[in-house]
Amino acid sequence: MGGALAGCASPEATRAGTAVLPTAPEKSAAASPSPSRPPESGPPVLAPGPGGLTPVFERRAAGRDGAAASDKVVALTFDADMTADQGRRAAGGEHFDNPGLIASLRRLKVPSTVFMMGRWAQEYPDQARSIGTDPLFEIANHSFSHHAFSSPCYGLPAVAAKDMRADVERAFTAIRRTGARHVVPYFRFPGGCYDDASLKALAPTGVTAVQWDVVSGDAFATDADAVAEQVLEGVRPGSLVVMHCTRSAAPVTDDALRRIVPGLRERGYRFVKVSELMRG
């Protein structure tokens, strides 16, 4: 789990899968295309990138009048990670869920987007259904296998280009089979690693890939205050924060959240789901 989760939340997550400085993920040629509005009943998606590649969303961009950039909104996102080979560890008592974190989000009334793995949904179907039927949340796709969609990527095994679409569709199927209803057509690459080949492979799925501009640093952290401070220092109007929903490898996220939320609200921020952030 070490390398997998570290890559999932790493500040070095990047398009090519190679390390860069700890800033926002590097943009690809397909990043930040123009918004495209779906039917009124559905969540927004982005228009395809150059050459029809899967579009990539990292944060809310400024509108022509700058209004969108000055709107003090922020999206907290949580990766529900569990790799395909960790069922035995879960059966042995290791916790890859974090019901306390979800309870805190409900208590604090924080709309959030959970990027859920298909394997996680299979292991915790009741929790997946509870999250996915609560209008406070929306569930997005974080793959089924947590294999890398471009390599190298923090030691993750690679998924072949011909299997990428099936991996994503398998995850959506596993999530929906739990009874989750609030499922959005967004996808987060394991490790944040992608390239043009993976963007091309996923284009037929119609998903919008979602990255981030603020890394919480909660993976394997032991100091909740340090995690909270990193988020509070990094957030700007329109930011998208990556955190985790797994007690096994992100044990202080719940504690950090209880400082992050009041801290940002004191600064005038409003919490939104990715779908609202994308809607602009």
Regions flagged by a language model, labelled:
Residues 45-68, 251-280:
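C-terminal domain-boundary segment and adjacent tail
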Residues 74-77, 112-116, 138-141, 185-188, ...:
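Structural recognition of the beta-strand scaffold that forms the well-ordered cores
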Residues 84, 92-93, 116-125, 188-195, ...:
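Acidic-and-aromatic substrate-binding clefts and catalytic sites of carbohydrate-active enzymes
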Residues 96-99, 224-228, 255-259:
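Charged helix-capping and loop-helix junction motifs
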